[in-house]
Amino acid sequence: MPRKGPVPKREVLPDPIYSSRLITKFVNRLMYDGKKGAAEKIFYSSLEHLAEKTGEEPMRAFEKALDNVKPHMEVKARRVGGATYQVPMEVRPERQVSLSIRWLINYARSRGEKGMTAKLSAELLDAFNGRGGAVKKREDTHRMADANKAFSHYRW
């Protein structure tokens, strides 16, 4: 922990096409070895494909896909008297966004399609329709929180 007070949040610049900070965060998370151009190319083509399939505006379709993956509750380990309890906690909005982005990208990478563009667009389309790996992860997280509701009084 820093002694000089809280560390300031770094400002993320909005992306050039849609002027969205959310897209910039997604692209930065998608990027490997500092190759932002390649990550942007993959993302924008996936977004166009998503808009084509859904018939909605690209940004709106992306936001809906992200909303379908955002977790509202999660469990955190808490030690009480030698026992570790999984305590359900609410997820902060900032963490909701970062978790949903992380899950979407991880499950897109583990898909069977050929090429990252196809993988990402398929995962985004599945998330838009309320299915797929990332949505399943969210459901599992909510199920865990629901199962451990008895330990919610250990919240800190």
Swiss-Prot record:
Pfam families, alphabetized: Ribosomal_S7
Coiled-coil residues: none
Keywords annotated in UniProt: Ribonucleoprotein, Ribosomal protein, RNA-binding, rRNA-binding, tRNA-binding
SUPFAM superfamilies attached to this UniProt entry: Ribosomal protein S7
BP terms from Gene Ontology: translation
Family: Belongs to the universal ribosomal protein uS7 family.
Function recorded in the entry: One of the primary rRNA binding proteins, it binds directly to 16S rRNA where it nucleates assembly of the head domain of the 30S subunit. Is located at the subunit interface close to the decoding center, probably blocks exit of the E-site tRNA.
NCBIfam families: rpsG_bact
The protein's name: Small ribosomal subunit protein uS7
